[in-house]
Amino acid sequence: MSAVLTHVQLPDELPAARRILKHPRLMQSHRLTLLVVLTNAVLLGVGIGNGWWGSVVNVALIAQINFALGILIRQQFFVNALCTLVMRVPKSWPLKIRWTLAKGYHLGGLHVGGAICGTLWFWALTVIAIGQVDAGLQVTYCLQSLLLFAIVMTSRPKFRTEHHDLFERMHRFGGWALSALFWISAIQLGSASTIVVLTITTVSSLLPWTLLRRIPVDVIRPSSHVALVSSNRYRPMAGSTRSIARHPFKQWHSFAVIPTPGAPGFRMAISRAGDWTSYFIDNPPSHIWVRGIATAGMANYGSVFNRVVYVVTGSGIGPVLAHILANRVPMQLVWVTRNPVKTYGQALVDEIMRAQPDAIIWDTDADGKPDMVKLAYSAYESSNAEAVICVSNRKLTWTVVHGMEKLGIPALGPIWDS
């Protein structure tokens, strides 16, 4: 199979001026983060010019608005509503417009921007408040600043990857403690506007926890690398993800959920990729915890295109299988994995082939690792597709997405923005 790619010739890249905007460092989520930062910088300039910069009430309100932006943009019901709206866009619209709308999942950049600016405003508030508020409120602001510093330090990408459990505990329990301190300081300050904003963000944050449930599951292990989880509860929308946990106050992890054809419930594939997943596979539970609702995934935005190519590696087949079975958009599947039958089981491979008889399954044990950009382009060209959707690890996803977009081909892929 490798010999096929030697004849694939990639077209010329876009001119440098257009190509630079396709670089991963300038992806839409990063641009949105920058937009929030610049907007706050302008607001700061206006505040200094008009003399309200030193007002504790004003700065506290701006800080809370930034945090509200960061929280609401990730609210599950908002995410699903936005995705549903984009999915209804007529496919007759110009490709450039649909390509832009398909990047709707990059709105997570607003979450990052709101969190960054909200933190900076609160740190500034702690300094500004000196001499303007009583000792009790000043102590509350200092505690907020210290807690924000701890959350920021544990949220750094490298730390988050190496110490995920600590990051998650700090983000959750630190966030709850911070919310309590926000309420204490807002009541002490007596600002009605700040209390209104805080009420909205608190309700948004608590809503998923009101839907906390413990549900029974069946777990099958076709190999030591993967566990296939199924449940007959809560049939989700195709292409969505669901947060699960073995204990409600410990680690939560999100996985793509696959509706079971002709039956209630869902399935998910969990591959060995760390301590939590390894323990899950080696010690499968009889029940898991779920909270909130299943949330629309990145690949749902591919519904705006007339035909797509899915380029998938390994257990990335999980989130893509839901779209294969839903069959909302004509597609070509390219699945690159080691010995698919041995790793994922004959039943899953047969299910994929029934739904996608022309699927390209590249066995890396037999054929080695392919040039993913050439493989993606070959499938894109031969299938007359409009876009490529890649579901893989971070490095490979960005390689394929960037490789396609610098050729002028629409491409989507996870962005790991938080």
Question: For the regions a protein language model found, what residue spans apply to each?
Answer:
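FNR-like FAD-binding dehydrogenase module
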Residues: 1-418
